[in-house]
A protein has these predicted regions:
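Extreme N-terminal starter segment of soluble prokaryotic enzymes
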Residues: 6-11
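Active-site neighborhoods of enzymes that stabilize oxyanions during catalysis
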Residues: 118-122, 306-487, 493-495, 499
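His/Asp/Glu-rich, glycine-adjacent segments
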Residues: 67-234, 384-419, 438, 452, ...
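Short, structured active-site-proximal loop/turn typified by the sulfatase FGly-forming signature C/S-X-P-X-R
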Residues: 24-78, 137
Length: 509
């Protein structure tokens, strides 16, 4: 039931891979006047913690569902589907998409991610607001599941690509009241030209959002600005002032449509957030190739998956490794762990073990046994932990821990575990390992390394993200006209706080 309805509508603006220091640099250089005006009027959390792995599908699901991967079930850019015995690839690169089949990737990315992979037992923001009778809207964004049915409307390059392969994408979907998803879904006619080309999508998103503002067509809008991610991948995060400036220009179109900054803020509250940050990448890590020296690794288009011993899912600067229950000789978990521990570039090895210290593995989707203990290994340093009462974290959760805190560069002060290098480390690793589709091993790579995707691509010479490291994980969270009066109301903010803040604004918490 709706509580006291707010006087302001709310726009949740997401800027992919936005780093707080680069945002501030753009403002200081006069390249982002719109964002500067919003920063002057709002409450900034400079170090909001992303998901782990800190990649867009996982982070966006966390943002919109208010839960970690154990709750929303999306585990990476690439993951192994234990039930279907295949990889799920969301488009790490065009080359990776070709390796798995472009149509298969498109189907998983657009349709299955929302209507099959995302936990059906968890409600998205759109679903909760739709049920409450609020008008919802979304420009192109990975997680859009809502209560309104939308017919597919192929257009432009995507139509020609689908027609050329003679594969028909004719599926309706369920989303917010107003849904724009490039060439695929458009809930109304707008004078906006969609683009399926990475790095050229902000303009279409801003055009659609401005039309919705002009028509007073929503109470809640998720407005996405994804192009900064592509620019940072190609040129490195230190060069992202250019793409931030373009995102600022696109946001200014909404301000203009509303009649200027004062008129805009009189009618709209704003939350601006990054899904993750980026760090510089210098080397690719061919994880599957290295493990193939000792085991049979499942390939993208494997005709006999039952013969494979391992599945390897690169996901930026993180990776999942799965032990497969094939028909042949199974890989020994301890041998796999030892092999991973000597690979240069693997910084953290995260896994579960039982009370006897034996590895816990899963052959089917589902959470591990209730007595499982998480382990983080970093070279010879080893830390075991599970929920308990021994020590707290900055989010208020409590843990039992045993081992070397140097594994995550952590200290305990006044009964609270802190790590500047790996923010919110215990909860993020625990959530990743408890994801039903998570690997038996979840890896976080060392600075400068990125896992080579199944298309043979890395962003060496540019930037990437995915690791547990602070450089990948910390981004801005800005509240204007809603949310806390001061950032210190929480000692540590994460993406899991975004959905509750939206619901609170509409009196639904």
């Amino acid at each position: 039931m709706i509580g006291a309805m707010p006087t302001k509508k709310l726009i949740l603006t997401y800027v992919d891979s936005l780093r707080t220091d680069m945002l501030q640099r753009a403002v200081d250089e006069g390249r982002a006047p719109t964002f500067a005006a919003l920063l002057d009027r709002g409450v900034l959390v400079p170090d909001c913690v992303s998901s782990f792995p800190s990649v867009t599908p996982v982070a966006c699901a966390e943002m919109v569902c208010g839960k970690g991967a154990d709750g929303h079930w999306v585990s990476g850019m690439n993951w192994y589907h234990r039930l279907e015995r295949r990889y799920v690839e969301y488009g790490s690169s065009m080359e990776a998409s070709r390796a798995f089949g472009v149509f298969r990737v498109l189907y998983d990315l657009v349709y299955n991610m929302n209507l099959a992979h995302l936990n059906p037992g968890v409600s998205t923001l759109f679903e909760q607001l739709d049920v409450a009778g609020l008008r919802t809207a979304c420009t192109p964004f990975l997680i859009y599941r809502g209560r309104h049915r939308h017919q597919v409307s192929l257009d432009g390059l995507l139509r020609r690509a689908v027609d050329a392969t003679r594969l028909k994408f004719r599926h309706h979907t369920w989303g917010p009241g107003e849904l724009f998803y490039g060439d695929l879904y458009a809930s109304r006619e707008v004078p906006c030209k969609p683009s399926s080309i990475p790095g050229s999508r902000d303009g279409y998103s801003a055009c659609c959002a401005a039309e919705l503002v002009k028509d007073d067509a929503f109470d809640f809008l998720l407005f996405s600005l994804p192009d900064n991610d592509n620019y940072s991948h190609r040129h490195g995060p230190e060069a992202s002032v250019e793409s931030i400036s373009k995102a600022d220009h696109c946001f200014a179109k909404l301000i203009e449509a509303a009649g200027g900054i004062d008129a805009f803020l009189a009618d709209y509250a704003l939350i601006l957030v990054a899904d993750h940050a980026q760090t510089s990448v210098h080397r690719g890590l061919p994880l599957a190739e290295l493990l193939e020296r000792n085991w049979s690794v499942l390939q993208p288009s494997e005709s006999q998956p039952e013969r494979a011993q391992l599945a390897v899912s690169p996901t930026g600067r993180a990776a999942h490794v799965y032990l497969l229950p094939g028909e042949g000789e199974r890989a020994d978990p301890e041998a796999v762990r030892e092999a991973l521990s000597v690979i240069e570039g693997v910084e953290l090895i995260c896994r579960f073990e039982d009370n006897s210290g034996h590895p816990v593995t899963r052959s089917e989707p589902g959470t591990p046994p209730s007595d499982a203990t998480a382990v983080i290994e970093r070279g010879p340093r080893r830390l075991r932990f599970r929920p308990g009462d021994e020590v707290g974290d900055l989010r208020g959760r409590r843990w039992e821990i045993d081992g070397d805190l140097d594994a995550i560069e952590a200290t305990i002060e006044d009964g609270l575990l802190r790590s500047e290098t790996f923010p919110d480390p215990l909860a993020r690793v625990w959530l990743a390992l408890n994801c039903p589709h998570g690997g038996d091993f979840v890896l976080s790579l060392a600075e400068g390394y990125e896992a080579v995707d199944w298309g043979g691509v890395t962003h060496a010479g540019g930037g990437s993200h995915g690791a547990l490291h602070a450089g990948d994980s910390l981004g801005p969270l800005l509240f204007v006209g809603c949310g806390p009066k001061d950032a210190s109301e929480r000692e540590q903010w994460t993406l899991r706080d975004v959905a509750p803040a939206v619901l609170e604004h509409f009196g639904l918490r």
